[in-house]
Amino acid sequence: MKYVGIDLGTTNSAICSFDGEKIHLYKSPEQHDVTPSAIFIDRRGNKYVGSRAYNSAAKNPDNAAVLFKRLMGTSTPVKLPAVNLTMTPEECSAEVLRTLFGYLPEEIRGDGDTGTVITVPAAFNQMQKDSTMSAADAAGLGRVALMQEPVAAVMSVMRQRKNDGVFVVYD
């Protein structure tokens, strides 16, 4: 079984996989370790996610959705007035998740035996967690589990260090 880990961040997001031995971080098409959690829709209706969306948002903020993770678990819509479009925070997050999943090699994406873990802030309430699960479902990720960010950090440190000890993780 293969595992995929996703940091669905407020500002930036990232994706990696674990094959049982090694963790692989997948870069964006621009060769960045992280992808901006941004969506941009141009006047023709073309949708962009990531760096191009983030860079375009600076010039045309009314065509862009950024910082939508802060709205997860609420009924507050994400408005893109320049293109007369309203999206839910879940729809925005699903776009980012689909984009990240597209960075994976086909043998991982097409594997029906891939489990996905998405990290969420420790302060996320149940509505925000449910909203994140809805976004993952809308993105077609299949089997998904959520893990609080500090827990994921401790697990990463424990995997890298084989000796006993006390580890403190600050988030």
Q: Model features per residue range: what roles?
A:
Residues 1-36, 41-170:
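N-terminal phosphate-binding loop and flanking beta/alpha elements of the actin-like ATPase fold
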